[in-house]
Swiss-Prot record:
The chain crosses the membrane at residues 491-508. Keywords: Cell membrane, Glycoprotein, Membrane, Signal, Transmembrane, Wnt signaling pathway. The gene is APCDD1. Residues 1-26 form the signal peptide. This is Protein APCDD1. Its main location: membrane. InterPro entries: APCDD1 (IPR042425), APCDD1_dom (IPR029405). Pfam families: APCDDC. One of its GO terms (cellular component) is plasma membrane. Residues 27-490 are extracellular.
Length: 515
């Protein structure tokens, strides 16, 4: 079987490098005869690993999340904070879906990464119709939409002038020369009944409505605290391609204004806002990035083209080394594992980004990697490939880890070693004071940010800190982690294996992960 190397390399390293694996570690049992210092380190390692393991185990047990199929999107949905889109663009969203399938969506745009200075607002009206369950993204629902009207309102004179020039350069004569746009006045960018349309000036599209997922969960096991989240399709990282892109992943979720996390201050502010009163979020200071300690996924994450995973990163700031555990699954709630990847390398401290306000730039190098197939289909697929380009030929077994460093990675998974990526990070605190770590969003075209000019300008879903420091750089007990990870995965049923094989082949044919 031949799988295009270029396609593989586009998506596997993205999922790899800082995309995601991760179940927490097993507890270590120190030898009672060990040196006191070793006992102290072992005890600390056991504690931090128990914390990280507990947080990821919660995800792998379904995190008590209910997915609505088909989704009920009727209601008012709002952003939970200041979102960053590629460009960068800083935005908050407020979407209303009505029982007659119509919708009204506000997109509030800002001049900074804290969403404190609104510059313009789009008001989008249209109609949406849910279709079938997505055959590409499991757990998602496909939808069609039709736009009826789009209005734009500038919130200061300089922006009104700039937008007027942009629109007229794109659509000559769209705005009469004697009637330039003014501040706080609504103007049509699209009106269905008279054919008025110039959305391409802003590279605007609402294709996010083509992929939908609704999740429900009760926070802290409290039946009185229901939270509903609406996931809409991802936005292409190249603004010029947004009008032609069909989503294959998700944006950060919106929360139902009626059933939202009560600690979400931004939710309440955005809920009360409109085009004449855009939301102004509370100002926050940018946190200094400190890459140390351990960080894990907060949810089962979705990557383009049938890739579901969780991540666990370990940073050793004493010597600038890092480790990443990436656990991949065939399902959107991360219950059925397919393979794991353990990677490690070095990172260099960068500088504050001149392009993305609030971001800090890093360079990551990967020089060591291990792979573990977690189901029969994946092991079989790895054994199909000829030559020693992914571990020892024909030697792959379910649950048995192999070091692929000596074969310069794994061509079957699209991984080449050594590999360098140019990253961007930011750090925030949630309403409960917990630290969140964001790293760069993978390019939508599947390429790798292997040059400075390809560095991301937006972010992935955040990781949450599960251990604040790491005593010293050492390889964590991967065998124990894999045993825990695989203990709940009955991957030998023929039907499950067949499905996993199809999913794996479809995914691998589009990956290009550490290229």
């Amino acid at each position: 079987m031949f799988v295009p190397y270029g396609s593989l390399m586009r998506y596997l390293f993205p999922a790899l490098l800082l995309h995601g694996l991760g179940e927490g570690s097993a507890l270590l049992h120190p030898d009672s005869r060990s040196h006191p210092r070793s006992l102290e380190k072992s005890a600390w390692r056991a504690f931090k690993e128990s914390q990280c393991h507990h947080m990821l185990k919660h995800l792998h047990n379904g995190a008590r999340i209910t997915v609505q199929m088909p989704p009920n999107i009727e209601g008012h949905w709002v952003s939970t904070g200041c979102e960053v889109r590629a460009g960068p663009e800083f935005i908050t969203r407020s979407y209303r879906f009505y029982h007659n399938n119509t919708f009204k969506a506000y997109q509030f745009y800002y001049g900074g990464n804290r969403c404190t200075n609104p510059i313009y607002t789009l008001v989008i009206r249209g109609k949406i119709r849910l279709r079938q369950a997505s055959w590409i993204i499991r757990g998602g629902t496909e939808a069609d939409y039709q736009l009826r009207n789009i209005q734009i309102i500038s919130h200061n004179e300089a922006v009104a002038k700039k937008l007027s020039e942009l629109v007229n350069n794109t659509c000559p004569g769209f705005i009469p020369e004697d009637s330039p746009w003014e501040q706080d006045v609504s103007y049509d960018l699209l009106r269905e009944e008279n054919g008025c349309e110039c959305t391409k000036a802003l590279n605007f599209a609402m294709h996010e409505l083509q992929l939908i997922r609704v999740e429900k969960q009760y926070l802290h096991h409290n039946l009185d605290h229901l939270v509903e989240e609406l996931f809409l399709g991802d936005i292409h990282t190249d603004a010029t391609q947004r009008r032609y892109y069909r989503p294959s992943s998700y944006q950060p979720p919106l929360q139902n204004a009626k059933n939202h996390d009560r600690t979400c201050i931004a939710c309440r502010i955005i809920y009360r806002s409109d085009e004449h009163h855009p939301p102004i979020l509370p100002p926050k200071a940018d946190l200094t990035i400190g890459l140390h300690g351990e960080w894990v996924s907060q949810r089962c994450e979705v990557r383009p083209e049938v890739l579901f995973l969780t991540r666990h990163f370990i940073f050793h700031d004493n010597n600038n080394t890092w480790e990443g555990h990436y656990y991949h699954y065939s399902d959107p709630i991360c219950k059925h594992p397919t393979f794991t990847i353990y990677a490690k390398g070095r990172y260099s401290r960068g500088v504050h980004s001149a392009k993305v306000m609030g971001g800090t730039e890093f360079v990551f190098k990967v020089n060591h990697m291990k792979v573990t197939p977690m189901d029969v289909s994946t092991a079989s697929l790895l054994n199909v490939f000829n030559g020693n380009e992914c571990g020892a030929q024909g030697s792959w077994q379910v649950g048995v880890q192999q070091d692929v460093t000596h074969t310069n990675g794994c061509i079957a998974l699209g991984i080449r070693l050594p590999h360098t990526e140019y990253e961007i990070f930011k750090m925030e605190q949630d309403a409960r004071g917990r630290y969140l770590l964001y790293n760069g969003q993978r390019p939508s075209d599947g390429s790798s940010p292997d040059r400075p000019e390809k560095r991301a300008t937006s972010y992935q879903m955040p990781l949450i800190q599960c251990a604040s420091s790491v005593p010293r750089s050492e390889e964590s007990p991967e065998e124990n982690k894999i045993r825990l990870y695989s203990s709940r995965a009955p991957a030998k049923h023929p039907s499950a294996s067949a499905l996993a094989l199809v999913l794996f082949i479809c995914t691998v044919s589009y990956w290009d992960i550490l290229s």
